Amino acid sequence: MKNINPINTNAWNSLQQHFNNIKEVKIRDLFLLDSQRFDNFSAIFDNQILLDYSKNRITTETLYLLFALAKECDLPNAIAAMFSGQKINRTEDRAVLHIALRNRSNKIIAIDSQDIMPEVNAVLSKMRQFCNQIISGQWKGYTGKPITNIVNIGIGGSDLGPYMVTEALRPYKNHLNMHFVSNVDGTHITEKFKYLDPETTLFLIASKTFTTQETMTNAHSARNWFLKTAVNEQYIAQHFVAISTNANDVVKFGININNMFQFWDWVGGRYSLWSAIGLSIALSLGFENFELLLEGAHAMDCHFTETQLEHNLPVILALINIWYNNFFGFETEAIIPYDQYMHRFAAYLQQCHMESNGKSIDRNGNIINYQTGSIIWGEPGTNSQHSFYQLLHQGTKIVPCDFIVPAISHNPLGDHHLKLLANCFAQTEALAFGKSCQFIEEKFIMGTTSEQKLSIIPFKVCGGNRPTNSILVKQITPYNLGALISLYEHKIFTQSVILNIYAFDQWGVELGKTQANSVLSELATDNIVTCHNSSTNGLINYYKSWRYKTDDK
């Protein structure tokens, strides 16, 4: 990949001039000028996902210049570099090949001239066999009872992705009860224990290194809880499996090495749900549905690699975000799925976006003087309408939004889904077009005085011109969800290429982990701590003065 500072490109300079010319443009006027704006600013994928980006503050010239920026930053060759196994994660000297995990064409993908697909397929085959044993009841616990509850213990990418997918695809769920534990706060796992029976519970310990502090703390607590009933450590092998690369520590824990599922250093944590980390997905939904998830993602991979930039959905989304973040100064982006099953989708994308592109050093090692990653947040509609939409409509911060909604519901109860769709479509229209003084004045009832009108009208005006993308999915199926996740993954990668940053490391996360280990040893003693700044010293020492006292109020 070439390391190109985007603000030094001709396209960036042209975009700045273009922005100065159209920064006051109204979305309302763009629609008046182009009766075919929806047709000209929308794209469809596989007759399953429609992207409508017409309600944005962009023109055909904006897009022309944004695509020119992508080409000048060598995006097509960067895409080819990732898919061909080049080590584009240079700070860790690794390839980035989560796309190989869902390579349903099974074409050769090589790292250092070695085809990795045989290893990928071997793990998938092992996952299929294991899932069939658990789901069928063939796998028995230590008292001979089949497994009924599964607990995935992991954090970050080992939790957010699998949890999001199993929730989003609950209509496809089988009889197994799936639980997720991530937080090192003992409350998280303690609350799970209340509903579990050691005789019928299986734990999945998801940690690449098998040393992640939060995961291993929870794993050992689960082990201790299990042994209080089972007593004999030999039974651990029937109730614990590992998703890891650290065979030695897995065996020391008591897990049978045959029950360790491998993945590789070319799989980043936040892109790992396609790997053995997705074992919880396959167990919860059945392996056939896990394969459909992979197939949908692979189909979007093919779209990303084979479609011209001008019609490429991930590229379009990425460029629009760069346009808002760098030229308009819109710093955040809301992800709003109008589907209750998708309630964890925004949290999942929050990690993907912010851990990938939350960088301030470019690929040349220089401090960046432009904007990189946006702040990603969101909640499901319609709940969010009664939470933060007031700010979206009338606040001083403009927040570009992605509205995601299925055309077909899994639960066609009365007119519920029609009302959900109506709210989704109406909100994007209201955000774009607003409500003018004239419109409000016309709605006043007869007999209202001019003075009364003037006193209230300013508070009711909604200026509109708030940009949105609408993503209409035919139905939230395993295939379509896979494609949707892949769409956002490639959006993130596209942004990183153009913004000249490394998207697949996370050194900021590593810093916090290291310092936490240092503080942990200090918390274990009664000694007064003075080695930090006054704030950290004060917090630690107050904790020590309070920890043995119960609340008397």
Curated annotation (Swiss-Prot):
PROSITE patterns assigned to the protein according to its UniProt record, in alphabetical order: P_GLUCOSE_ISOMERASE_1 (PS00765), P_GLUCOSE_ISOMERASE_2 (PS00174), P_GLUCOSE_ISOMERASE_3 (PS51463)
Cysteine disulfide links: none
Uppermost EC category: isomerase
Xref: InterPro entries: G6P_Isomerase, G6P_Isomerase_C, Phosphoglucose_isomerase_CS, SIS_dom_sf, SIS_PGI_1, SIS_PGI_2
Residues spanning the signal sequence: none
Main location: cytoplasm
GO CC terms in record: cytosol
GO terms (BP aspect): gluconeogenesis; glucose 6-phosphate metabolic process; glycolytic process
Cellular compartment(s): Cytoplasm
GO MF annotation terms: carbohydrate derivative binding; glucose-6-phosphate isomerase activity; monosaccharide binding
Reaction it catalyzes: alpha-D-glucose 6-phosphate = beta-D-fructose 6-phosphate
UniProt pathway: Carbohydrate biosynthesis; gluconeogenesis; Carbohydrate degradation; glycolysis; D-glyceraldehyde 3-phosphate and glycerone phosphate from D-glucose: step 2/4
Active site annotation, chain numbering: E355, H386, K513
Record bears the keyword RNA-binding: no
EC number(s) on file: 5.3.1.9
Described purpose of this protein according to its UniProt entry: Catalyzes the reversible isomerization of glucose-6-phosphate to fructose-6-phosphate.
UniProt similarity note: Belongs to the GPI family.
The protein's name in its UniProt record: Glucose-6-phosphate isomerase
